């Protein structure tokens, strides 16, 4: 048995068991597995256990005491939670532990694993310093080979070998090292998409971090079938450096007819066994994932056939009994059910929107119509969101077909009305899978002929084609592809033979696992539903926001051109104001709010230049449709914005103008200043009846620091602008060799941008206000840089990036940190600073910010419609009381796990905000920081 002694010299420890079964199981665990002896049994409910060879007389007092013990359900739940996080989290960060010393960790690990006990080894299974396990009561028990638990420079636990024997044959190396946890193969298949490289990078580094070998399988299933070191290559940590910024897939992709046959899959099976691969991660479309799952289901029969034909040994047959498969969806079409977004979809949408923004200029110059064809096969997601983001005149998508006569009449009616009101350009977006309701395809040439023959428009056709696939991934795809890659590694490590093959999905902005077979089946049902003309079911199988986006496009597209949908008595006067610093999506929110109001019959007003503009200059203008045409694609704030609060501007005058214009509702678009403004307006209701109207805040700030939401307009635009800036800076650092750039990030006291930018840019280090900068951490980071550059000799892409939030430290400024690094480097590398400043606000808003601005604005108007009559009841009340019913009409509209929700400002201000620091109390991006540090190889104190 392994000898052990308690680190801190404690004389005894007491453990409580809730029932006789766990009491006896605990005795067996400590005696049979850990080498304890029963020292004393004074009664049937008390046992003293002591180590047989312990000079310190350390004992464990085990009591059968249901009153003081945790319940059986609590113990079971705790063990389940810890076991579930075995490969995800360090147990020491979750639960306190008892630490012992052991002179034979390998023997201890074998004893524990033979007994079926979960074992976590640190830092990895190849050369562990510490081992942790769980006893039957859920207690966390630790063992170390060090006399000092905090030592890290003790002798190596591996056998010493002479230099000439450092390189051994495969058989010899197996004797020197403990077995690798898993050998993972990762491949990309089907059509390429931006974000595949970040996904592969994450799989490689997460796998290595967790003690696995990782092989990249080149050329998709073709490479798997051909096999050999040319196609199946072991990949090291540094091999994937720089992959974040590269588009497409660096390991190649190809369609493989041979893999569709059993003979091809048999070859693939043999090739994987030859390389020792027992887990496969596939990034591709539904066809690729279907093939992977079929491969897994046939695996037992494939290895049986290989054994019978003597192509593998009996030992190999026993070793590779099971194959774990995990899929991730790489597709620009966003056509997979069970996930809200596929890897590459938002990057493709960005290409489309940029192209249409460029086309807008020439279309406007010549007063032309442009037909733009986008990809998508059976899915109209790209066409729909591109139409919404660019304010296209008309879209044709597979999910909403109409008869040939109907779509032609409808399109011509809308386009002619837009032209009649002074619009010079026409944009029609056609998805490549667009069909009429008789399933006949609709081509761009057909659409062109209709516009030319019926309206006499000078019309051009633009087919974007493979431009939509090209280029580097946007921030969203880099971040979520990386998170999915890490989760895919966790999945193959946690799955067993009975676990259905998982697919990594995004649901409600969270990375989740869904059964791969079910997701593929639902996806294929979309095509079947369209073929059977069941178009309602086809739409229902899309992501949760698809139908809402469709309705929003129809509503905003018909603004001011068709009779309003509300009766006269239901129509309102709705005002909108921008407050705080500019943010991408502000103009999109104003445009969508105004056009939706027009379609409903409301009168939209814009308050220019914030509350100071209203109080000092009565800057109120009703909004005309033609005046805001094209605003959805503009950055900044066309109606002006500043940081002046209502109390500072003169809240009495503000209330007066609200009364004068008879506003029935107000929408505020802005950041923390808008949050405080909403609070002040809500508080002032008791004195000013004109403020007793529905008040809605749409968060819009690059800092993403508004309480009540996990997403603010402008944050995605900021991330993309900052990411592009960092890509250029990192390129400069790499070209110069041995250079570090310390880049300052905006965001106030919020580390949201710095944290996500670290993941998107591949920065080695980020400092954020939530953590601050300690001298110990800075010293460790500098030592890490020294080691990193020392290991880079002869390697390319050797530049480094450090991100520092502007408020991470008042003393350790960007310049100071750079100077310290420069001094400590002693000429081995140098350090420079880069401060992008207000460049981070971005120019043209990202498609995500545009689309979400539209969704936010329309939901805000709907909220005002719903609560306006309720407010009217107490608007002129003399005895005004702030009841829950009243306070619920002044709200922040936010996203929580992809769901839009309205939260009263009073609740957020009183309980969920840190007003002095201009921050929310709940920090929801901590897990992203952990993953960022893991993938950059950084150790955080």
UniProtKB/Swiss-Prot annotation:
Q: Which cofactor does it need?
A: Mg(2+)
Gene Ontology annotations for the cellular component aspect, listed alphabetically: 6-phosphofructokinase complex; mitochondrion
The active site annotation covers 333
Q: How is its activity regulated?
A: Allosterically activated by ADP, AMP, or fructose 2,6-bisphosphate, and allosterically inhibited by ATP or citrate.
Q: Which SUPFAM superfamilies match?
A: Glyoxalase/Bleomycin resistance protein/Dihydroxybiphenyl dioxygenase, Phosphofructokinase
Keyword list (alphabetical) reads:
Allosteric enzyme, ATP-binding, Cytoplasm, Glycolysis, Kinase, Magnesium, Metal-binding, Nucleotide-binding, Transferase
Catalytic EC class: transferase
> What does the UniProt function comment say about this protein?
Catalyzes the phosphorylation of D-fructose 6-phosphate to fructose 1,6-bisphosphate by ATP, the first committing step of glycolysis.
Subunit and interaction comment: Heterododecamer of 4 alpha, 4 beta and 4 gamma chains. The gamma chain bridges the N-terminal halves of the alpha and beta subunits.
Q: Could you identify this protein by its name?
A: ATP-dependent 6-phosphofructokinase subunit beta
Gene name as annotated: PFK2
């Amino acid at each position: 048995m392994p000898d052990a002694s308690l680190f801190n010299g404690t004389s005894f420890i007491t453990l409580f068991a809730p029932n006789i079964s766990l009491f006896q199981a605990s005795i067996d665990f400590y005696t049979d597995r850990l080498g304890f002896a029963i020292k004393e049994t004074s009664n049937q409910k008390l046992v003293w256990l002591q180590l047989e060879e312990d000079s310190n007389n350390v004992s464990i007092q085990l009591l059968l005491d249901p009153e003081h013990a945790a319940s059986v359900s609590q113990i079971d739940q705790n063990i389940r939670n810890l076991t579930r996080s075995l490969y995800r989290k360090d147990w020491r960060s979750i639960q306190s532990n008892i630490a012992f010393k052991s002179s034979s960790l390998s023997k201890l690990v074998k004893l524990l694993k033979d007994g079926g006990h979960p074992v976590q080894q640190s830092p990895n299974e190849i050369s562990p310093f510490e081992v942790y396990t769980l006893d039957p009561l859920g207690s966390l028990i630790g063992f170390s080979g060090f006399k000092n638990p905090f030592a890290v420079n003790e002798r190596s636990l591996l056998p010493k070998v002479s230099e000439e024997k450092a390189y051994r044959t495969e058989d010899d190396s197996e004797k020197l090292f403990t077995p690798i946890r898993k050998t993972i193969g990762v491949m990309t298949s089907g059509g390429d998409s931006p974000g595949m490289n970040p996904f592969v990078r994450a799989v490689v580094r997460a796998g290595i971090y967790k003690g696995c070998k990782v092989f990249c399988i080149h050329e998709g299933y073709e490479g798997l079938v051909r096999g050999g070191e040319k196609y199946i290559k072991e990949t090291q940590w540094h091999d994937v450096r720089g992959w974040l910024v590269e588009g497409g897939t660096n390991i190649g992709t190809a369609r493989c007819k041979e893999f569709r046959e059993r003979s091809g899959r048999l070859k693939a099976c043999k090739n994987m066994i030859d390389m020792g691969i027992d887990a496969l991660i596939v990034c591709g479309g539904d066809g690729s994932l279907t093939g992977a799952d079929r491969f897994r289901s046939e695996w037992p029969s494939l290895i049986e056939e290989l054994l019978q034909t003597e192509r593998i040994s009996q030992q190999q047959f026993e070793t590779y009994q099971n194959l774990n498969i995990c899929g991730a969806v790489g597709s620009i079409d966003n056509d997979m059910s069970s996930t809200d977004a596929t890897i590459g979809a938002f990057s493709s949408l960005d290409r489309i929107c940029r192209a249409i923004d460029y086309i807008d200029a020439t279309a406007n110059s010549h007063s032309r119509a442009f037909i733009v064809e986008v990809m998508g096969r059976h899915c109209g997601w790209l066409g729909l969101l591109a139409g919404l983001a660019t304010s296209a005149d008309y879209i044709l998508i597979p999910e909403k077909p109409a008869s040939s006569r109907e779509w032609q009449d409808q399109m011509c009616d809308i386009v002619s009305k837009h032209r009649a009101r002074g619009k010079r350009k026409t944009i029609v977006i056609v998805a490549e899978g667009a069909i009429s309701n008789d399933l006949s395809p609709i081509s761009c040439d057909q659409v062109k002929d209709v516009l030319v023959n019926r309206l006499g428009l000078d019309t051009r056709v633009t087919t974007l084609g493979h431009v939509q696939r090209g280029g580097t991934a946007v921030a969203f795809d880099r971040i979520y592809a990386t998170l999915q890659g890490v989760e895919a590694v966790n999945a193959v490590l946690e799955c067993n033979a009975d676990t259905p093959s998982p697919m990594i999905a995004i649901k409600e902005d969270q990375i989740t696992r869904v059964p791969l077979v079910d997701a593929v089946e639902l996806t294929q049902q979309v095509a079947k539903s369209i073929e059977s003309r069941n178009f309602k079911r086809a739409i229902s199988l899309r992501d949760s926001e698809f139908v809402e986006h469709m309705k929003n496009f129809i509503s905003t597209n018909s603004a001011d051109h068709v009779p309003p949908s509300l009766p006269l008595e239901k129509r309102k006067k709705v005002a909108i104001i921008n407050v705080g610093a500019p943010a991408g999506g502000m103009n999109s929110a104003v445009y969508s709010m105004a056009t939706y109001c027009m379609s409903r019959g409301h009168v939209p007003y814009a308050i220019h230049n914030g509350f100071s503009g209203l109080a000092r200059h009565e800057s109120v203008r009703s909004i005309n449709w033609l005046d805001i045409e094209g605003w959805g694609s503009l950055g900044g704030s066309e109606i002006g914005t500043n940081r002046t609060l209502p109390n500072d501007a003169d809240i009495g005058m503000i209330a007066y103008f609200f009364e004068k214009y008879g506003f029935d509702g107000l929408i505020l678009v802005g950041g923390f200043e808008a949050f405080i403004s909403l609070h002040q307006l809500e508080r002032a209701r008791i004195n000013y009846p004109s403020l007793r109207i529905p008040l809605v805040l749409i968060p819009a700030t690059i800092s993403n620091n508004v309480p009540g939401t996990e997403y603010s307009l402008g944050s995605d635009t900021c991330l993309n602008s900052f990411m592009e800036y960092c890509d250029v800076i990192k390129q400069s650092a790499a070209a110069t060799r041995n250079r570090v750039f310390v880049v300052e990030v905006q965001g106030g006291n919020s580390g949201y941008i710095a944290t996500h930018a670290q993941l998107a840019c591949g920065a080695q280090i980020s400092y954020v206000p939530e953590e601050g900068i300690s001298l110990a951490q800075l010293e460790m980071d500098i030592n890490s840089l020294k080691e990193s550059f020392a290991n880079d000799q002869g390697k390319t892409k050797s530049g480094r990036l450090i991100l520092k939030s502007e408020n991470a430290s008042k003393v350790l400024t960007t310049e100071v940190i750079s100077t310290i690094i420069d001094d400590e480097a002693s000429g081995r590398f140098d350090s420079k600073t880069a401060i992008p400043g207000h460049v981070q606000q971005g120019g043209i808003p990202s498609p995500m910010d545009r689309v979400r601005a539209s969704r936010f604005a329309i939901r805000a108007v709907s909220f005002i419609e719903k609560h306006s009559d309720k407010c009217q009841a107490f608007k002129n009340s003399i005895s005004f009381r702030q009841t829950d019913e009243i306070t619920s009409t002044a709200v922040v509209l936010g996203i929580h796990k992809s769901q839009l929700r309205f939260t009263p400002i009073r609740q957020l201000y009183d309980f969920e905000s840190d007003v002095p620091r201009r921050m929310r109390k709940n920090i929801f991006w901590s897990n992203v920081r952990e993953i960022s540090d893991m993938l950059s190889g950084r150790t955080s104190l």
